[in-house]
Swiss-Prot record:
HAMAP family assigned to the protein according to its UniProt record, in alphabetical order: IF_2_B
InterPro entries: EF-G-like_DII, IF2_II, IF2_N, P-loop_NTPase, Small_GTP-bd, T_Tr_GTP-bd_dom, TF_IF2_bacterial-like, TIF_IF2
Listed Gly residues bias regions: 263-295
Any GO MF annotation of the entry: translation initiation factor activity
Coiled coil: none
Biased composition (Low complexity): 56-111, 121-162
Spans annotated as G3: 481-484
Domain called tr-type G: residue spans: 422-596
Name the record gives this protein: Translation initiation factor IF-2
Region (G1): 431-438
Region (Disordered): 51-325
Organism: Micrococcus luteus (strain ATCC 4698 / DSM 20030 / JCM 1464 / CCM 169 / CCUG 5858 / IAM 1056 / NBRC 3333 / NCIMB 9278 / NCTC 2665 / VKM Ac-2230) (Micrococcus lysodeikticus)
Assigned protein family: Belongs to the TRAFAC class translation factor GTPase superfamily. Classic translation factor GTPase family. IF-2 subfamily.
Transmembrane segments: none
C-alpha cells in the first residue's frame, strides 16, 4: 500500500492536520509537517486513535464492494456511487450522465463491459446494512469529511476535450449556481494557459454549498441512474491509494493518469474516469500534462537509506555549518570525569569533527581526545538539547566494579545477620601537638604490651590493637596513630570514613588551642562521636573545669553539665586514669554505635598510610573493615594491585589472617597507593590488574579536566544565581587573635538585602596558612582569607593543585569590601599580585653606608631590582611595601638574579633582617573581572 500524507489522512478522519500532527507526536511518531508521508504502520496507529472517524470514512468504500466481489477491478469504480448515499436526497443529487459523457463512452468500446457489473445504485441504498445509515444520518456534519467533500457523483464529466465548448471541470467551482453557464468556453485545458485545466486543490476539496450542481448544458436526469466509473482514478475517499496491481486490465487504449495520485473523479479527457470529478489531475507533486493528459509517472518508494536520511535530517540541528543530532531537552547523557568529545560523540552517534566545530562556534577550543570539564559539557549539552550528568567518583568506581561483577552495596545488603559478628571500634586520637597526644598513645600501648615483650613496641605502623577488659569481658580497641590530623582530613576528603570514635586531647594547663579547635572541626565535620581526654592533670597549673567551659562554647557539653560528651581527666606521664579513658571509649561505642561485620568472606577495607621501603618495596598499612585478609590473597588498593606476600602486626610479628578492624602491614603491591584508598580482594590477579589500570586512567583523565579553581569570589554570585551555592564558607587565618576576631565580626555583620546569602566561617586561627587549612577548604569548598600571614611553599603548591582560592590582605577594610561585593555581585576590576620570586636570607652583612645587606639564595623565580617586596619570618609577614633598592652579585650591580644563584639584596632603610627570613618579590598587574 502506498504511503499517505498527513493532511490527506487527517481529512479522511475528519480532523485537522494540526490535530493529526499532535496525535502522532503523542504516539511517539515524529513528523515534520502535514505534507510529510507516513508509513502504513503509522497510518494504522493514527486510525486506531480515531476509531469512530475511521469507520465512518471506510463505510462508503466498503458498502458497494459486495455486488462486485467477482471482479478484481470492481473496487475502483465501486466508490463512485457512495457519495450518493451520504448526500441529501434531491432531484439534483442524481443527474444522468450528460451528452459529453455519452460521447466519451461511445468512442471507447473497450470500456463498455465495465459498467455492467459495477452499477452500484441498489447496493448503495440497501437499508439492511448497518454501515449505510451512519454517513447519511448527519448530512450537515459530513461537510468536512472526505465523503462529503468529494465532487458530485452523479454529474457527467463533459470530458477534457480541448475543442469542446463545455470542456473541463466547471462543476468544481464552489460558487457556481445550479443552473450553470451552458455555452461558456473553458480555457482551462489550453496548454498555454497558466491553470492547465486544473483548479487548486483547495477549490477541488471545498464542499458545494447548496447541493450538487448539474453539468453545464446537460439535459434531464437519465432514468438508468448515474454512469458508473470505468477509469482507474485515484484513491476513493476514506480508503487507501491504489497501486499498479489494482488497475483494471481492460483499460489499455486510453492514457492513464498518474499512479495513485488522482482525486476521485477520473483521468484525462477521452479516457475512463469517475463521474463528476475534476478531470485529469495528475496528482500532488507531478507536472500536469498538456491538453489534460496526466503528467509523468511518480517515482517509486523511497529506499531505506533515503528514509533514514530523511529521518536524520528531521532530527538534526545545524550549528556552525554542520548538522549534529539534537535532543529534546530531557535526554540525559551520563559522562565520566575527564571525558572527551569523542565520548560525547559516541553517546549521541555524531561525528566528533562536527562537535569540535560546534564547540568552536560556542567559543571553546578543544580536540577530539582532550579531556573536558563539566562546565564545557554543560554548555555543549544545553546547545544541542541534552542534559549532561558527570558521574561522581563514587558512582564511577561503583560502575567500574560492576563491570567485573563486583557489587559492594549488594553484598552488604544481602548480608545474613547470622554471619555478622561484633568487631572492635576504630579510634583516632587528635589534638594539639604539644598537649601530650603522642605520650598518651605510648601510655596506652605500653600498658597493654604482651607479657614477655620487653622494651615495648619495636616498630610503629600507625595503627594498632589493644585488649581491654570491660565488665568481665575481654574487648579490643583499634587505634589509628595520625600525627596531627593531616591523614584524617585526607581520608575524609576522599570519602573513606574509617573512624568510629575520635579522642580529643587537651592539656589541662594550656587550654583550648587553635589546633585543638581545628581538630574539633574535622571530627564534627566527619560526624563521629567525640571523647575528650583532659591531659596533664598532675601539674599544679591544671584547670580541668576551665577546659570543660571552653569546649562548651564549641558544642561539647560534658555529661556533668547535662550534655552527652564524656570527659576523662588523665595523665599520660604518670598513667593516671588510662583504663577509665578506655572504658569511656567502649561506653561511647556501645551507646552510639552498632559495630558488626562479616568475617566469612573476601576482605574489604581501606589503606591508612603507605610508604616505599628500600628493602621491602611498597609497604601499605591497611585496616580490614569486613571479611578476612589472608596471605596469598590477590588485592587491589586504589590504582595499586598485587598478591599479599606477607603481613605484620603492630609488634612486627608475622600474621597469616586479619579479621575485621584489624590493622596490618601488607607487602607485595605493585606501587604505593594513596592514604584513604579502599582495597578489596579479587578472585585472580588479572581482574585486580584490570581494575587498577582503569582506576589509574580515570584518575589521570579527571586530573587533566580538573579546573584550577573550584569557587572564587568572582563567580560566587553566578553560582548563587544558578542555585548551585547558597552559603559562602570562609577560613580566616591571621597574625593575631584580635585581628582575626575583628575580621570575623565585621564579615558576619554584612547585610546582603533581600537575596540573603549565608556567610559561614568554618575555621579561624592564628599563624601561617597550613596544609590542614587547604585540606579543609578542599572538602568544604571554602575560601581562605589570610590577614598578614602567608602560606608555606608546599602549601601554596597544594592549594594551586586542589583549586583552593586564597586571598591575602593587610587592611581589614579591603577584606570586608571584597567579601561584601562578592555577596552582592558587585565585584569590580582589581589589581592582581603576580609573584616574581623569593629568596632566603642566608647571612646578614652590616654596612655603614648601605645599611643591612641580605646575603640571599634565590629559591624560586627571579629577584628584580626595584620590584616590590615583603619580608616573611616564620610564616608571618614582618613588613610590607618594601622595594628592592639594590641588587648585587659578586660586587657588581645586577638587574635581576635568577633561581639557584646567590645575591646581595638591600631593602633601603629597612634593616630588620635576620637569617632564615624570606624575601618575596612581586608586581601588581591590572586584572579586569569578568
Amino acid at each position: 500500500m502506498a504511503k499517505v500524507r498527513v493532511h490527506e489522512l487527517a481529512k479522511e478522519l475528519g480532523i485537522t492536520s494540526k490535530e493529526a500532527l499532535s496525535t502522532l507526536k503523542d504516539l511517539g511518531e515524529f513528523v515534520s509537517s502535514a505534507s510529510s508521508t507516513i508509513e502504513p504502520p503509522v497510518v494504522k496507529k493514527l486510525r486506531s486513535a480515531y476509531p469512530g472517524a475511521g469507520k465512518s470514512a471506510a463505510k462508503p468504500g466498503s458498502t458497494p464492494a459486495a455486488p462486485a466481489a467477482g471482479r478484481s477491478a470492481a473496487p475502483k469504480p465501486a466508490a463512485a456511487p457512495s457519495p450518493r448515499a451520504v448526500a441529501p436526497t434531491s432531484d439534483a443529487g442524481a443527474p444522468a450522465p450528460g451528452p459529453a459523457a455519452g460521447r466519451t463512452a461511445a468512442t471507447k468500446p473497450g470500456v463498455a463491459p465495465t459498467p455492467g457489473p459495477a452499477a452500484p445504485t441498489p447496493a448503495a441504498q440497501v437499508p439492511a446494512e448497518p454501515k449505510a445509515p451512519q454517513p447519511s444520518a448527519t448530512p450537515g456534519s459530513a461537510a468536512p469529511k472526505p465523503g462529503a467533500a468529494a465532487p458530485k457523483p452523479g454529474a457527467p464529466r463533459p470530458g477534457n476535450n480541448p475543442f469542446s465548448p463545455k470542456g473541463g471541470s466547471a462543476g468544481s467551482r464552489p460558487g457556481a449556481r445550479p443552473g450553470g453557464r451552458g455555452g461558456a468556453p473553458r480555457p482551462g485545458n489550453n496548454p498555454f494557459a497558466p491553470s492547465q485545466g486544473m483548479r487548486s486543490g483547495r477549490e477541488d476539496r471545498a464542499p458545494r454549498p447548496g447541493g450538487p450542481r448539474p453539468p453545464a448544458g446537460a439535459g434531464g436526469p437519465r432514468p438508468g441512474g448515474p454512469r458508473p466509473a470505468a477509469g482507474a482514478g485515484g484513491p476513493r475517499p476514506g480508503g487507501p491509494r491504489p497501486n499498479p496491481g489494482m488497475m483494471p486490465k481492460q483499460i489499455t487504449p486510453a492514457p492513464q493518469p498518474a499512479r495513485g495520485r488522482g482525486r476521485p473523479g477520473g483521468g484525462p479527457g477521452g479516457g475512463p474516469g469517475r463521474p463528476g470529478g475534476p478531470g485529469g489531475r495528475g496528482g500532488r507533486g507531478n507536472a500536469q500534462g498538456a491538453f489534460g493528459r496526466g503528467g509523468g509517472p511518480r517515482k517509486g518508494r523511497k529506499s531505506k537509506r533515503a528514509k533514514r536520511q530523511e529521518f536524520e535530517q528531521q532530527h538534526t540541528r545545524e550549528i556552525g555549518g554542520v548538522k549534529v543530532p539534537k535532543g529534546d531537552g530531557t535526554t540525559v547523557l551520563r559522562l565520566r570525569r575527564g571525558a572527551s568529545l569523542a565520548d560525547f560523540a559516541e553517546k549521541i552517534r555524531a561525528d566528533v569533527a562536527d562537535l569540535v566545530k560546534v564547540l568552536f562556534t560556542l567559543g571553546e577550543m578543544a580536540s577530539a581526545n582532550q579531556s573536558l570539564d563539566e562546565e564545557t559539557f554543560q554548555l555543549l549539552g544545553d546547545e544541542l538539547g541534552y542534559k549532561v550528568q558527570i558521574v561522581s567518583p563514587e558512582d564511577e568506581d561503583k560502575e567500574l566494579l560492576e563491570a567485573f561483577d563486583i557489587d559492594l552495596e549488594a553484598e552488604e545488603a544481602n548480608e545474613d545477620e547470622a554471619d555478622l559478628e561484633p568487631r572492635p571500634a576504630v579510634v583516632t586520637v587528635m589534638g594539639h601537638v604539644d598537649h601530650g597526644k603522642t605520650r598518651l598513645l605510648d601510655a596506652i600501648r605500653s600498658s597493654n604490651v604482651i607479657e614477655g615483650e620487653a622494651g615495648g613496641i619495636t616498630q610503629h605502623i600507625g595503627a594498632y590493637q589493644v585488649p581491654v577488659e570491660h565488665e568481665g569481658e575481654q574487648r579490643r580497641l583499634t587505634f589509628i596513630d595520625t600525627p596531627g590530623h593531616e591523614a584524617f582530613t585526607a581520608m575524609r576528603a576522599r570519602g573513606a570514613k574509617v573512624t568510629d570514635i575520635a579522642v580529643l586531647v587537651v592539656a589541662a594547663d594550656d587550654g583550648v588551642m587553635p589546633q585543638t579547635v581545628e581538630a574539633l572541626n574535622h571530627a564534627q565535620s566527619a560526624g563521629v562521636p567525640i571523647v575528650v581526654a583532659v591531659n596533664k592533670i598532675d601539674k599544679d597549673t591544671a584547670a580541668p573545669d576551665k577546659i570543660r567551659g571552653q569546649l562548651t562554647e564549641y558544642g561539647l557539653v560534658p555529661e556533668e553539665y547535662g550534655g552527652d560528651t564524656m570527659f576523662v581527666d588523665v595523665s599520660a606521664r604518670n598513667n593516671i586514669n588510662i583504663d577509665q579513658l578506655l572504658e569511656a571509649i567502649l561506653l561511647t561505642a556501645d551507646a552510639a554505635l552498632e559495630l558488626t561485620a562479616n568475617p566469612h568472606k573476601a576482605a574489604r577495607g581501606v589503606a591508612i598510610e603507605a610508604n616505599l621501603d628500600k628493602g621491602r618495596g611498597a609497604v601499605v598499612t591497611v585496616l580490614v573493615q569486613t571479611g578476612t585478609l589472608r596471605v596469598g590473597d590477590t588485592m587491589v588498593v586504589g590504582s595499586a594491585h598485587g598478591r599479599v606476600r606477607a603481613m605484620f602486626d603492630e609488634n612486627g610479628n608475622a600474621v597469616e589472617a586479619a579479621d575485621p578492624s584489624r590493622p596490618v602491614q601488607v607487602l607485595g603491591l605493585s606501587s604505593v597507593p594513596r592514604a584513604g584508598d579502599s582495597f578489596l580482594v579479587t578472585d585472580d590477579e588479572r581482574t585486580a590488574r584490570q581494575i587498577a589500570e582503569r582506576r589509574e586512567a580515570a584518575d589521570r583523565n579527571a586530573q587533566l579536566a580538573k579546573r584550577r579553581k573550584r569557587i572564587t569570589l568572582e563567580d560566587f554570585d553566578q553560582a548563587v544565581a544558578e542555585g548551585k551555592l547558597d552559603t559562602l564558607n570562609l577560613i580566616i587565618k591571621g597574625d593575631a587573635s584580635g585581628a582575626v576576631e575583628a575580621l570575623e565580626d565585621s564579615l558576619l555583620k554584612i547585610e546582603v538585602g533581600e537575596d540573603e546569602v549565608q556567610l559561614r566561617v568554618i575555621h579561624r586561627g592564628v599563624g601561617a596558612i597550613t596544609q590542614n587549612d587547604v585540606n579543609l577548604a578542599t572538602v568544604d569548598n571554602a575560601i581562605i582569607i589570610g590577614f598578614n600571614v602567608r602560606p608555606a611553599e608546599r602549601v601554596a603548591d597544594l592549594a594551586d593543585r586542589e583549586g583552593v582560592d586564597m586571598r591575602f590582605y593587610n587592611v581589614i577594610y579591603d577584606a570586608i569590601d571584597d567579601i561584601e561585593n562578592a555577596l552582592k555581585g558587585m565585584l569590580k576590576p582589581e589589581y592582581e599580585e603576580v609573584e616574581l620570586g623569593s629568596a632566603e636570607v642566608r647571612e646578614v652583612f652590616r654596612s655603614s653606608k648601605w645599611g643591612n645587606i641580605a646575603g640571599s639564595l634565590v629559591r624560586s623565580g627571579l629577584i628584580r631590582r626595584n620590584a616590590q617586596a615583603r619580608l616573611v619570618r616564620d610564616g608571618v609577614v614582618v613588613s610590607e611595601h618594601l622595594r628592592i633598592e639594590s641588587l648585587r652579585r659578586f660586587k657588581e650591580d645586577a638587574t635581576e638574579v635568577r633561581e639557584g644563584y646567590e645575591c646581595g639584596i638591600g631593602l633601603g632603610s629597612f634593616n630588620d633582617i635576620k637569617e632564615g627570613d624570606v624575601i618575596e618579590t612581586f608586581e601588581m598587574q591590572e586584572k579586569p573581572r569578568v
